Amino acid sequence: MLNKIKNINKELDIININSASELEFFRIKFLGKKGILNSLFKEFKKIDSNEKRNIGLSLNILKIKIKNLILKFKFLKKKKIDDLEIDDLTKPGKKKNLGSRHPISIIKHRIINIFNKIGFKICEGPEIEYDWYNFTALNFPYYHPAREMQDTFFIKKSNKLLRTHTSSVQIRYMEKNKPPIRIISPGRVYRNEKISAYSHCMFHQIEGLYLDKKVSFKDLKSTINFFIKNFFGKSITRFRPSYFPFTEPSAELDILWNNKWLEIIGCGMVDPIVLKNVNIDPDLYSGFAFGMGIERITLMIYKINDIRYFFENDLRFLKQFKKEF
């Protein structure tokens, strides 16, 4: 039997394969159910136990050699095809399957670029946040509904949570930097809400903060109006009184869109209590803050009727957004 194995090895040493059909014939000949290797293993069962050690080792080496030859010829065949493709300059080029920007990314960067023009710089922070930065420092009283389990994702056995807004970034920045401050903080935020066509447990916000001496509500209105004009074009807007724990006075801005008033921005003058919490003198400095949901604006611009489309990774949907609006 060792002589058979030796003769097969000699045959393998000089074998040459030039096509896919020859390679398949070689595979079946040696590794098929009725192939040479199977026949040898059947014969191996009948030999004397004293010879099995040496013959078994030779058989396994032969099997590995045959499999390696198949892999080698497969590689050479592929390389040959690749070389032909490179050399054949008459063949048509391959179309590249290019991706496209996500609609939320398109809107987010458009907003950022507008505020960059008037001196706002980007500032980011962690999505897992301490209660101090997300609530306490922002003047949320202990009885505020946002502190309840039904509105916020709290992390068990800790004073951490998933941030409910990017205002927490403003607190972190004010703790380490003194006025003048002019920042915007884009990012993901989380609310314990039922997922539906108009709400989601995770969405994106951009919030802004301007802090300096003698900043007034007039400065807030002019900044917001600058954004509206550059983003939406000539539009009819209105400011309505509102309430936020971290601003006083507070307002919401509505835009007339398809003959309906739609709320798109919450804003107001930074509450003096918030400034005291970050060791900034409210008698010397004042400022304003604002925030907007990116999904809401994206739904408006692209006339999309279901927020869930943004998170389903459906290429039929995503491929529609190849250019800036």
Swiss-Prot record:
Q: Which GO terms describe its cellular component?
A: cytoplasm
Domain of life the protein comes from: Bacteria
Q: Where in the cell is it found?
A: Cytoplasm
GO biological process per UniProt: phenylalanyl-tRNA aminoacylation
Which cofactors does this protein require?
Mg(2+)
Principal subcellular localisation of the protein: cytoplasm
Which reactions are catalysed by this chain? tRNA(Phe) + L-phenylalanine + ATP = L-phenylalanyl-tRNA(Phe) + AMP + diphosphate + H(+)
Signal peptide per UniProt: none
Say yes or no: keyword Transport present: no
The EC code for this enzyme is: 6.1.1.20
Kindly report, in one word, the top-level EC class recorded for this enzyme. ligase
Q: How is the cofactor bound?
A: Binds 2 magnesium ions per tetramer.
What UniProt keywords apply to this chain's record, in alphabetical order?
Answer: Aminoacyl-tRNA synthetase, ATP-binding, Cytoplasm, Ligase, Magnesium, Metal-binding, Nucleotide-binding, Protein biosynthesis
Molecular function (GO) terms for this protein are: ATP binding; magnesium ion binding; phenylalanine-tRNA ligase activity; tRNA binding
> Which residues are recorded as binding Mg(2+)?
E248
* Complex and partners: Tetramer of two alpha and two beta subunits.
Hey, which family's this protein in? Belongs to the class-II aminoacyl-tRNA synthetase family. Phe-tRNA synthetase alpha subunit type 1 subfamily.
Q: What protein is this chain from?
A: Phenylalanine--tRNA ligase alpha subunit
Q: Which gene encodes it?
A: pheS
